[in-house]
Amino acid sequence: MRGKTMGVKVKLLEYTPNPEKVVASAAKLCYSPVGVEEMAKDLSEEKVNKFLNMLMSYGHESPIEHVSFTFAAEGVSRSLTHQLVRHRIASYSQQSQRYVKLDQFQYIIPPEIDKDNNTRSIFIEAMENSQKAYDKIASTLEQKYISEGMKRKEAEKKAIEDARYVFPNACETKIIFTMNARTLMNFFRHRCCTRAQWEIRNLANEMLSEVKKVAPNLFKYSGPSCVNGNCPEGAMSCGKAAEMKKIYL
């Protein structure tokens, strides 16, 4: 059983080919009297960039829904994925604790806990106790089901699906998810914000870095809400809008 601090690992697995041209084509079609093929021939890289800038300035976001991005994330906690799936216009596939037996589960240690020896010791002890409880419950239930005539493989599966309830939010997990560009921009507004929790903020920043490599003009103004507008946090605002613009723009 090993703990991790801030070891989120994000990879952009797949994305719509030529995402910026696809978005520009969809947007231009709304205003063009010509056919799709003729319109596409006229879309040079320069015109694509110009059209994307115009779209963003107008707030015309529906065309950006035509492109999607698929990510894989590892080294993240269940606490993070509970927050992630609140962004509902997306598709998610997460490692199952019901079907995957965790003989030695890994866990995420929050940095504030990790840098204090006392709280770190308490935290690690709690993680170790969770593993011991899981092992004992799973073993006890498995033997019970076998004694009742159940086959071993089926008994193990049935046992771990209940034993998993003792695992904490810190339990490390892996997830693959797909979002369209409009959902991503909304995600970045909320999760790149300093008021988002540290772990999902780290994830959001890594994701933004990845999509900027393949669609730099599309995500040029992405980041927390204050980067390209007003802060919606009111009295809870961090007051760092100018600093955020320097970081993200």
Swiss-Prot record:
Q: Might you give the EC number(s) for this enzyme?
A: 2.1.1.148
Query: Needs which cofactor?
Result: FAD
Recorded hits in InterPro entries, A to Z, give: Thymidylate_synthase_ThyX (IPR003669), Thymidylate_synthase_ThyX_sf (IPR036098)
Name the residues that bind dUMP: Q83, L84, V85, R86, Q94, Q95, S96, Q97, R98, R164, R191
Protein origin, superkingdom: Bacteria
Q: Which residues form the active site?
A: R191
Which residues take part in binding FAD? S62, R86, H87, R88, Q94, N180, A181, R182, N186
The annotated pathway is:
Pyrimidine metabolism; dTTP biosynthesis
Cysteines joined through disulfide linkages? none
Pfam families hit by this protein: Thy1
Q: Which CDD domains match?
A: ThyX
Instruction: State the reactions this protein catalyses.
Output: dUMP + (6R)-5,10-methylene-5,6,7,8-tetrahydrofolate + NADPH + H(+) = dTMP + (6S)-5,6,7,8-tetrahydrofolate + NADP(+)
Q: How is the cofactor bound?
A: Binds 4 FAD per tetramer. Each FAD binding site is formed by three monomers.
Query: Where does the record place the ThyX domain?
Result: 8-225
Keyword annotations for this protein? FAD, Flavoprotein, Methyltransferase, NADP, Nucleotide biosynthesis, Transferase
Self-association and partners: Homotetramer.
What family does the entry list? Belongs to the thymidylate synthase ThyX family.
Name listed for the protein in its UniProt record: Flavin-dependent thymidylate synthase
